[in-house]
Amino acid sequence: MKIAVLLYPACSLQEITTLTSILCLSFGQSLDYLASENKIYTSEEGLQVIPDFTFKEVQGVVYDCIILPGTQELFVSLYDSRLISFLKNVDIKRTIVAAISSSPMFLGKAGLLRNRYYTGGLYMELVDYFSFLEKENMLHQPVVKDKNVITAIGFAYTIFSQTVLDTLGLELPSDFFLRKNFYSPEELTYHLEASDYQKILQKISQYERCIQE
């Protein structure tokens, strides 16, 4: 499976790391991080990230899924012709596009929301202002899935993650996202398999030998 995550100035990694973590750790997926330029981008959390490829370098590459985080610097990316051009070339009949928070606006400008229901963390004044955002198709719901286009409000990142995983056909245990108000000590006691424990002991031994040397 080929999956891309888009980066831009002040992108919100917090909104997508539940999803990206599950894709990598639970399903062994490798993600391509894409951006307009090959440079360091600073997320809204202050983390510095470097893309694997620029949009130009992946022209012609077909992704199974493209993930867009929100951003605090909305207009920097909205008027970035390289980002919008990349999105315009996405075939949403083949590619699942998942955008959260403010990033559905990028889909709108690229024409990917035309005649589709959507949501997002968008101010209604901006929905009124930009004609590419079809107000009659905006649903005030945490997550909206219309065929291969998934959009969400920022706080709904867990449901967003579930929806993307389901659409990709990646199944998790039914209680994976469940949280309780009380946990017994037994539920919070963890043990290794014997074979895994032996591997860890070997690794510890290697580190301890290095320190002694």
Give each language-model segment a name:
Residues 2-12, 21, 25-38, 47, ...:
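Active-site-adjacent pocket-lining segments in enzyme domains
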Residues 11-16, 42:
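Short N-terminal binding/cap micro-motifs at the start of the first secondary-structure element
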